Amino acid sequence: MELKGSRTEQNLLNAFSGESMARNKYLFFAEKAKQENHPEVAELFEKMAQNEGMHGKLLYHYLKGVGGTAENLREAVDGEYGEWSRMYPEFARIAREEGFEAIGKLFDEITKIER
């Protein structure tokens, strides 16, 4: 059976996205806990982030897997180019169109950083 185009592939993508977002969120929470002098809570969030990262790695294996360094560099360059040349400028335009000027500016700033 072919994974490409299957509901299972979509579930893998959704799960990978969720695990990736949770990992970042927990790292943000850990940083805040450190700022508020709660090292034990920060450590807990960091462990949770590590676990989410491992879940993401397992899921990614089925989606694409990690290639060789040259292939990984090409994929990274292509992804970053797409973000700053198309995705973020379009997001900025839409944000402004909908009246979210501050978010439009955020997308513009991210565009500059991504370049």
Identify what each model region corresponds to.
Residues 1-115:
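Non-heme di-metal
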